[in-house]
Amino acid sequence: MVKLRLKRCGRKQRAIYRIVAIDVRSRREGRDLQKVGFYDPIKNQTYSNVPAILYFLEKGAQPTETVYDILRKTEFFKEFRISFDKKRKEKQES
């Protein structure tokens, strides 16, 4: 199974995260399938490669909660009515 998750880059005390498509069984710093964006929490900048993200989501990739929140802030899911909210609601009820 493939997930969209964050991969840490940068220096000490100056983290930058890449949004990558990666196999679930790989470590955080493991080999990724493709880089699909980045997130800089200090400058609060994001970049996302929309066609690549859509490709992986159509193939069944699941974003982690953090990646989901980052993409939601960039209004990615408003344009492409993708229903991940059902799963999040079920988690909150449990």
From Swiss-Prot:
Gene Ontology CC annotation, any one: mitochondrion
Location within or outside the cell: Plastid, Chloroplast
Alphabetic keyword roster: Chloroplast, Plastid, Ribonucleoprotein, Ribosomal protein
Principal location listed in the UniProt entry: plastid
Alphabetized GO MF terms: structural constituent of ribosome
InterPro entries hit by this protein: Ribosomal_bS16, Ribosomal_bS16_CS, Ribosomal_bS16_dom_sf
Pfam entry (one): Ribosomal_S16
GO annotation terms (biological process): mitochondrial translation
Keyword Cytoplasm listed: no
Protein family per UniProt: Belongs to the bacterial ribosomal protein bS16 family.
The protein's name: Small ribosomal subunit protein bS16c
UniProt gene name: rps16
